[in-house]
C-alpha cells in the first residue's frame, strides 16, 4: 500500500511549479477515490511473462544412433539453431513422447521406445520446465520405464505431468510459479498402444476420461491463476482434428482451461482462439506435431514453438493470454543421417525444395481457424 500511495501522491497536480501548502495537499489527497487507486493497481501492478510449448520429442533409434559418440549421445549439437528460442522463455512446456530409461532398459525405437539418458540433457538444454509424459508410449518399458524417466527428470530439475510413480505422486498437483503467478498443468492420453496398465498401478498414466478430467480441473482451477491442459489424442497424420476431438477440447475450454495443447497426430493441426460462454478466451492448439524426431515424410518434419504473452493483474487476479505467436520449425536430415532442428525460415539453406512455399502453406494451415495467431519466422 505504501508504494501505491506514493504513486498517487506523485501523480497529483500542484500546478505551474507552485509549492502546494499542506491544506491544498490534504484536499487533493482526499479527492483520490478508491476507484482511482484500484485503476492504478491494475494498470501499474501487472506481471507479464512468456510461456512457450512444443510438440513431440520423439527419440527414434535412427536419431539416437545418428548422434552417438564415443562418450555417449550428443543430441544437443543438433538443436543449436532452435534452442535459444526456448531458452529465452520464462516458462517452457514440452511433450516427452518416449521413456528415458537408458541402456539398462535396452534402447529401442519404434514401436516400443526407450531413449538414452542423454535425452534428458536435451530437455534441460531446451530449458524445459515441465514435460508431459502422458502418451501412447508411456508404458513401453512398463513400471520401471515410468520410474526411470521420473528419476532422471527429477535429477535435471524438470517437472513431469500425466504419468506418476505412485498413488501419492498422482495426487500431487503440478503447479509452476512464474513471478508469483501460479500456472497449473494437467495431461492425459487416449491409451498406451494396447499395453495394459499393470494391476494395482492405475496411477502410472493419466488416461482420457472426460468425467475425470473435468473433476481434476475443478480441483486445480481455484488454486492457480492459469490452467494448461495437454491432450494426447487424435488421428495420426491427419491435418485437421475430427469433430469428436474438437468437442472434447471445447468442453475442456468451457471448464476453465486457458490453454489446451494437443499432441499425437505427428503433423500440425490449426490453432484456434475459442470464445467461451463466460466471455473469456481459450487458446487451443489441436496438434503441435513433432518437434524433434526421425520421421521422414515432410509433414512429420514440420513442427514449431507456440509462444504466449501472459498478463496477470494483481489487483483483480485476472490472468489473460494477450498474444499468441507460432514459429515453424523443420527437422533436416539426409535420410536417416545428420539430423538437425532448424527454423523453417532457414530450410532453403538446407536444401528443402520450395522452402518458401512450404513456409506459406504452414502459415495458412495454422491460421485456418483464426487469423489472431501470428506466424513469425523467428521469435524475438
Question: Language model features by range: what are they?
Answer:
Residues 15, 19-380:
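Acidic, metal/ion-coordinating pockets
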Amino acid at each position: 500500500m505504501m508504494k501505491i500511495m506514493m504513486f498517487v501522491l506523485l501523480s497529483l497536480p500542484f500546478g505551474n511549479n507552485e509549492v502546494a501548502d499542506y491544506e491544498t495537499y490534504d484536499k487533493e489527497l482526499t479527492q483520490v477515490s478508491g476507484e482511482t487507486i484500484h485503476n492504478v493497481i491494475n494498470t501499474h501492478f501487472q506481471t507479464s511473462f512468456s510461456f512457450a510449448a512444443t510438440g513431440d520429442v520423439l527419440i527414434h533409434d535412427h536419431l539416437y544412433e545418428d548422434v552417438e559418440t564415443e562418450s555417449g549421445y550428443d543430441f544437443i549439437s543438433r538443436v543449436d539453431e532452435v534452442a535459444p528460442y526456448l531458452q529465452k522463455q520464462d516458462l517452457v512446456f514440452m511433450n516427452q513422447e518416449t521413456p528415458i530409461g537408458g541402456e539398462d532398459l535396452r534402447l529401442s525405437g519404434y514401436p516400443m521406445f526407450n531413449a538414452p539418458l542423454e535425452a534428458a540433457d536435451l530437455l534441460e538444454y531446451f530449458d524445459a520446465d515441465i514435460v508431459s509424459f502422458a502418451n501412447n508410449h508411456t508404458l513401453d518399458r512398463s513400471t520401471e520405464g515410468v520410474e526411470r524417466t521420473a528419476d532422471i527428470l527429477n535429477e535435471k530439475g524438470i517437472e513431469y505431468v500425466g504419468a506418476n510413480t505412485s498413488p501419492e505422486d498422482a495426487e500431487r498437483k503440478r503447479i509452476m510459479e512464474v513471478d508469483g503467478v501460479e500456472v497449473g498443468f494437467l495431461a492425459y492420453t487416449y491409451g498406451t498402444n494396447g499395453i495394459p496398465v499393470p494391476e494395482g498401478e492405475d496411477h502410472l498414466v493419466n488416461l482420457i476420461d472426460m468425467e475425470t478430467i473435468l473433476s481434476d480441473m475443478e480441483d486445480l482451477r481455484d488454486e492457480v491463476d492459469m490452467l494448461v491442459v495437454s491432450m494426447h489424442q487424435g488421428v495420426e497424420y491427419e491435418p485437421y482434428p475430427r469433430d469428436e476431438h474438437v468437442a472434447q477440447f471445447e468442453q475442456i475450454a468451457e471448464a476453465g482451461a486457458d490453454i489446451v495443447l494437443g499432441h499425437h497426430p505427428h503433423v500440425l493441426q490449426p490453432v484456434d482462439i475459442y470464445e467461451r460462454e463466460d466471455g473469456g478466451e481459450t487458446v487451443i492448439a489441436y496438434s503441435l506435431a513433432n518437434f524433434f524426431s526421425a520421421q521422414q515424410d515432410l509433414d512429420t518434419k514440420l513442427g514449431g514453438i507456440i509462444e504466449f504473452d501472459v498478463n496477470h493483474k494483481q489487483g483483480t487476479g485476472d490472468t489473460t493470454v494477450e498474444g499468441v505467436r507460432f514459429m515453424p520449425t523443420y527437422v533436416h536430415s539426409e535420410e536417416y543421417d545428420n539430423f538437425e532442428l532448424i527454423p523453417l525460415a532457414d530450410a532453403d539453406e538446407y536444401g528443402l525444395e520450395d522452402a518458401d512455399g512450404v513456409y506459406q502453406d504452414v502459415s495458412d494451415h495454422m491460421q485456418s481457424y483464426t487469423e489472431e495467431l501470428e506466424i513469425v519466422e523467428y521469435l524475438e
